[in-house]
């Protein structure tokens, strides 16, 4: 999920999706062959499809869909808010426990407020049920392209935050969607009342009136914000 820029400035605007908020995943029953580990004969991974360095978790398989190997997914962001990555990417990496598999998706589409898809090699309902609980990753490079001055949250997490005077304010630890716009949760080293080190926190709205530049190459966000706010 992500938010919207409610200011007039175009710079600093975030699209309506980005980093993904994990949703609860239904746990498969402990017994039953169809609910066990991912079927290694159905979904395979080979050296040419090793786990990508830019893998981002975008959803999870929650159930089978129909009888022909389709699966139902909970996207960590809804369609148009991150679920688009599930719809666009055709190469998926699945992780269930310690086991990782690659799947070439033949079809993916919206179904109500969920995404349903057909991973290649998933031939029937039992095969699909075996995938239940698997976390779904795609390459960051397979995310849909964004317009200029739009950013995925996943690309903002970890950036340094400085103000226009060059004062370091901390590092983006998380992004929050308050329903109106996005908020950067910025962490910085601080000292508690007992004199012990602790982690301080700043909440800075990710809107154009405060965010003056997002310099991804430099690894920083420049804001109109004072250290004592």
Swiss-Prot record:
Localization: Cytoplasm
Annotated segments matching region Disordered: 1-21
Transport as UniProt keyword: no
Domain of life according to the entry: Bacteria
SUPFAM superfamilies: PRC-barrel domain (SSF50346), Translation proteins (SSF50447)
A Gene Ontology biological process term: rRNA processing
Gene3D superfamilies (alphabetical): PRC-barrel domain, RimM
GO CC aspect terms: cytoplasm; ribosome
Keywords, in A-Z order: Chaperone, Cytoplasm, Ribosome biogenesis, rRNA processing
GO MF annotation: an example: ribosome binding
Domain PRC barrel residues, every copy: 148-229
Main location: cytoplasm
Pfam families found in the cross-reference section: PRC_RimM (PF24986), RimM (PF01782)
Record function comment: An accessory protein needed during the final step in the assembly of 30S ribosomal subunit, possibly for assembly of the head region. Essential for efficient processing of 16S rRNA. May be needed both before and after RbfA during the maturation of 16S rRNA. It has affinity for free ribosomal 30S subunits but not for 70S ribosomes.
Subunit structure comment from the entry: Binds ribosomal protein uS19.
Family statement: Belongs to the RimM family.
Domain description: The PRC barrel domain binds ribosomal protein uS19.
PANTHER family reported in the protein's UniProt record: RIBOSOME MATURATION FACTOR RIMM
Protein name (database record): Ribosome maturation factor RimM
Source species: Burkholderia pseudomallei (strain 1106a)
């Amino acid at each position: 999920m992500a938010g919207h820029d409610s200011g007039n400035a175009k710079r600093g605007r975030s699209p309506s999706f980005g980093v993904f908020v994990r949703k609860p995943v239904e746990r498969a029953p402990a017994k039953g062959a169809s609910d066990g580990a991912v079927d290694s004969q159905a979904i395979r991974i080979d050296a040419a499809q090793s786990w990508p360095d830019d893998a981002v978790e975008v959803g999870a398989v929650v159930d089978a869909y129909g009888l022909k190997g389709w699966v139902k997914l909970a996207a960590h962001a809804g369609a148009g808010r991150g679920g688009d990555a599930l719809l666009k990417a055709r190469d998926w990496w699945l992780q269930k426990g310690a086991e990782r598999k690659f799947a070439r998706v033949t079809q993916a589409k919206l179904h109500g407020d969920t995404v349903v898809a057909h991973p290649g090699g998933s031939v029937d309902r039992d095969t699909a049920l075996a995938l239940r609980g698997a976390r779904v990753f795609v390459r960051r490079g397979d995310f849909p392209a964004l317009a200029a001055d739009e950013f995925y949250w996943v690309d903002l997490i970890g950036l340094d935050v400085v103000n226009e005077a060059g004062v370091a304010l901390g590092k983006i630890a998380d992004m929050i969607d308050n329903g109106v716009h996005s908020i950067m949760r910025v962490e910085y080293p601080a000292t508690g009342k007992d004199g012990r080190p602790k982690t301080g926190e700043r909440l800075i709205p990710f809107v154009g009136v405060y965010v003056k530049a997002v310099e991804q190459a430099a690894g920083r966000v420049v804001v109109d914000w004072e250290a004592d706010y």
